Amino acid sequence: MNTNSEQVLDQKSRPLRDLRISVTDRCNLRCTYCMPAEIFGQDYPFLPKGELLSFEELERLAKLFVHQFGVEKIRLTGGEPLMRKDMPELVGKLAGIKGIRDIAMTTNGVLLPVYADKLKKAGLKRVTVSLDSLDDERFKSINGRGVSVSKVLAGIEAAKKAGLGVKINMVVQKGVNEKDILPMARYFKEKGHILRFIEFMDVGNTNEWNRQSVVAKADIIRIINEDMPIEPIDPNYEGEVAKRYRYLDGSGEIGFISSVSDAFCTTCNRARLSAKGELFTCLFASSGFDLRTLIRSGQTDQELAEAIGTVWRNRDDQYSLDRALAKAVPRKKVEMSYIGG
């Protein structure tokens, strides 16, 4: 933690440690659980360029989160972050902020062959690549654009060659790709990349989520354990979202992100900044706090920091826990493509 920063706790005594920055709401894929093509079509009102925070505005806010509140990790998300022009330039600006330990990016991997080297040289540490199947036809159906698995695998290889750390995320949906659990586990075990299985979540309003479509963490663990024995291991750090497991044969590890069956709200230390400068304190939020207007109206760094601190101190989100207890009130939620995963 930055020794000059303030320890800011929310209503449930959770610190602010992790900032996720969505740099665009656009994507070159149309995955059914995130940006279904029938809704995010040609006429969808994506954010115009003038509404996006500039790189200079993003750098200014990032410095405040790091220096004033002790944020140590920044993850760049979207949409697809590499759809935003000149991303290595932004990475370079963020990497120059004293106090940041880790800069990562979540991407679908398609554009990594073009950008991986430049991103690494600019200061990016690692990427998390989304891939939901190794079956080409199934993956083409899921991504809504007919993009082949080979395009993503090429991106993963480009990232590895560039020296970036690589993890893979797979969203598992019953009746869609649960058959791919073992093939994915075997493939990335052999490749030496950590694969994380993510329970299908009710983020946004357009992915037709229902609990019957969720393949729970316990079921995924059972499927893998019967074929390749695994055991739980300690988290890398306090508040780590993925539950870590290792293969008993010593050939690596996998992870499980279980927002539905085993909520992790009690240790969530993440803030999310949307592409247009709204601050969100939960992935399942209905609305955010408008920082862009404050920036563009001439607010000082101190005034911005006070606003951010007030938002975090008032935070009491625990949507996934409330959902598990059947206490979550139905509401319109912000789309994942807007806020970042």
From Swiss-Prot:
GO molecular function: 4 iron, 4 sulfur cluster binding; cyclic pyranopterin monophosphate synthase activity; GTP 3',8'-cyclase activity; GTP binding; metal ion binding; S-adenosyl-L-methionine binding
Annotated binding of GTP, by residue: 20, 75, 106, 167, 270-272
Pathways per UniProt: Cofactor biosynthesis; molybdopterin biosynthesis
The EC number(s) this enzyme carries: 4.1.99.22
Segments passing through the bilayer: none
CDD domains in alphabetical order: Radical_SAM, Twitch_MoaA
Positions of [4Fe-4S] cluster 2 binding: 265, 268, 282
Uppermost EC category: lyase
Residues of the Radical SAM core domain: 11-231
Requisite cofactors: [4Fe-4S] cluster
Residues the entry annotates as binding S-adenosyl-L-methionine: 33, 79, 130, 201
Reaction it catalyzes: GTP + AH2 + S-adenosyl-L-methionine = (8S)-3',8-cyclo-7,8-dihydroguanosine 5'-triphosphate + 5'-deoxyadenosine + L-methionine + A + H(+)
Keywords, in A-Z order: 4Fe-4S, GTP-binding, Iron, Iron-sulfur, Lyase, Metal-binding, Molybdenum cofactor biosynthesis, Nucleotide-binding, S-adenosyl-L-methionine
Domain of life: Bacteria
Binding site for [4Fe-4S] cluster 1: 27, 31, 34
Free-text cofactor note: Binds 2 [4Fe-4S] clusters. Binds 1 [4Fe-4S] cluster coordinated with 3 cysteines and an exchangeable S-adenosyl-L-methionine and 1 [4Fe-4S] cluster coordinated with 3 cysteines and the GTP-derived substrate.
PANTHER family referenced in this protein's UniProt entry, alphabetically: MOLYBDENUM COFACTOR BIOSYNTHESIS PROTEIN 1, MOLYBDOPTERIN COFACTOR SYNTHESIS PROTEIN A
Subunit-structure text: Monomer and homodimer.
Family statement: Belongs to the radical SAM superfamily. MoaA family.
Function statement: Catalyzes the cyclization of GTP to (8S)-3',8-cyclo-7,8-dihydroguanosine 5'-triphosphate.
UniProt protein name: GTP 3',8-cyclase
Natural source organism: Bacillus licheniformis (strain ATCC 14580 / DSM 13 / JCM 2505 / CCUG 7422 / NBRC 12200 / NCIMB 9375 / NCTC 10341 / NRRL NRS-1264 / Gibson 46)
Gene: moaA
